[in-house]
Each structure stands twice: as C-alpha cells, then as structure tokens.
Amino acid sequence: MVRFKDKNLDMLRVALRQRESEMLSPIATLSTEGVRRVHDLSSEKGFRQIFSVDADRILHSRAYTRYIDKTQVFYLIHNDHITHRVLHVQLVSKIARTIGRYMGLNEDLIEAISLGHDIGHTPFGHDGERFLSELCRSNGIGYFQHNVQSVHFLDKVECKGKGWNLCLQTLDGILCHDGEIHNRTLEPIRNKTFERLEKEMLAKKNNLEIKLIPMTLEGCVVRMADTVSYIGRDIEDAIRLKMIKRSDLPRESVAILGDTNGTIVYNLVTDIIKNSFQNSYVAFSPEVSDALKRLKDFNLERIYMNPEIKKHTGLIKKLFAMLFEKYLDDIETENRTSVIFTGFLEDMSEDYIKSHCKEEIVRDFIAGMTDHYFLRQCPENMRPKMQFK
C-alpha cells in the first residue's frame, strides 16, 4: 500500500485549493473561507477540503443513521417504495450539487448542508414536529423547529454533547434551509458570525414567523433544492398510495412543469440554472415560480392535509405528551432504569447535562428518535397499527 508523506499531502491540499480558486465562481464560497467555532488542527491535515470534512462528519454521525426510519410525509405505512427522510436528503444533495456545478459553486459545502439539513426532524414528520413544539412551548423552552434542532444536534448533542465542530457556513445553511417557504429569488446575507447564528436560532425559537436567509449562495441553492426534491416525489408517493390521481394535478402547473417527478425536477432545475447563472442570487422565472406555488398549494390540500394520513394524529399527539411527561418525571425522580438514562444520558458528557434543563434534555431525546423507536417506548395497547399498502 502506498503511504503518502505529510509533505505530499500538503502539496495535494495546496493544489486542490489552487484548482478550486481557478474553477469556482468569484461569488462561490472557497474552502479557505470555512470557519469553525473551535480551531481544529485535525481537519486541516490530509487532503480533504474543510467542507468535505463537514460532510463526512455528518454522514458518519449517529443522527444521520437514524434518518433511515424517519417519516418524510407518510407514516405507519408498510411500503418499500415510499420515501423516507434518508432518501430525501440524498435527493436534495444530488439536485443541489447539480445546480451548484453549473453555477460554479462549492459542491462540498452544498453536500454538507444537504446531508445535515433534516438531522433535527422528529419522528412522524411535520406532525411530530408540531406536537413536540406545543410541548416545548408549554414547558417554557420556546417553539420546536427542526432546522434549529438540526444545528443544535450537530453542534451540542452529537459526540456525547461535544458536537462535531462544523463550519459556520454549514450550520448557517442548515438553519436557513426552510423549504416550506416559497421564494422566487434568494440572495445571501453574507459576513455572518457564530454570534449571529446563535441570535437567529434564539429568535426562531421565540417567533415562528422569523424568516432567515442563508449567508452563502450554496445555502440558497440547498433551500431551493429542498423544494425541488420533495414536490414531485410526494406526488408520486401519493399516487402509489392511491390518494390522488395524476389527472388531479393542476393543469396550469402541468403545462409548465410536467406531471411526473422526473419532468418536474428537470424543468425546475433547468429554470433555476437559466435564471441564476453568473448572478449573485438563486431564482426561478416568474412563470415557473407561479406554477410551483400552485403545485405546492395542491400538495398541501390534497396530500399533506389528506384525512387518510391524518387519522392517527390524535393518538400520536397523546403519545408525544405521555412520553414527554414520563421522561420529565424520570429525570426528576432519578429513575436510572428509564430509557432516557440508559439510552441517552448515560452516554452524554457532564457539560451537556449541566448546560441543559430537564425539558431540553427530554426534547433532544424525543426529537432524535426514529418512528419505530418512539412506538416501542409506548404502551403496546396504545400503539397505532401499521398499514400494508
């Protein structure tokens, strides 16, 4: 096996940086601009660029592993072809890197943001997020937002509470990724700091209406790609589950975007590239933006609010409240046989335990659960039944 000497790795790293500076757009984020909260000598050695290290750290995190059993839209359904969150983040990464390549942006940073953007999502998707947010709010720790939790998890919970020491640009892109908000144009707000990151996280916890803008073009691309990745995929899943028919799609949107996931993704990506190339912003054309907005409205009414996927929400909400109260009580009474100790706190550092109140600890534990792990913690006679479709 050939072993590289440190000198060879140094030369390789210099060559990669030189190539990056020559090939990327003047408004791309160079790897040399990456800023960590704590100086990290280990990430500066070897041949990997700084944002590539971030992507690797996220990919090898325990939280990333749990994507495999977290709901995207449809839960309590046995169907091997329905999208789960692990596939969603891969689709976001692929679509965003494709756009970024044609815009001359940093694909390593795009990949890191994409892979980490949903780390903080609860079990049972946005319904679970809403239930946990109500519990957090009533227990005095602010609203729960999965984008805020994603940053918190990667920065303060992973690695026994030490976090992964990711770059500011990566964490900012994750925080500002909100794909549910419709934007025709996104232009980055540059020159942010870790102090501003903390302020934006706090503001978002206290006010759901706060709108955040990424600090990099790469972050803006991921935010647009988030929507591109799910809009057609959710339609295909809903058709597969016989909740809608392809002929139900709004004609105005179909005329511009097509009626299959493949054509929708292709047309949206092409439009973004055409309208963003060599610009300081990322944008859709007005026509495509309007068609996408109509399609999002259709998905909301016919898929996300469909009674067929909402029939267990009352029970799941009750189970969230039951577990939240149980774990609070277990911490207060120091019930060390409880899973919140054996499955979580026993693996966390003293710094994490001392710097988080019991309500925040319970929030972090529940938010990190997969769908099946959550259900296994509930009384067997209260667990909703899985459907085979």
Residue ranges of model-derived segments:
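Histidine-centered, transition-metal-coordinating active-site segments
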Residues: M1-V86, L91-I99, N106-E107, G128, ...
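Short alpha-helical catalytic segment bearing the HExxH-like zincin motif
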Residues: I110-L115, R223
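Acidic, glycine-rich active-site loops and adjacent beta-strand->loop/helix elements
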Residues: L115-I119, C136, D178
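A glycine- and small-aliphatic-rich helix-loop capping segment at beta-alpha/alpha-beta transitions
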Residues: G125-S138
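Short active-site segment of divalent metal-dependent hydrolases/proteases
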Residues: G116-F124, S229
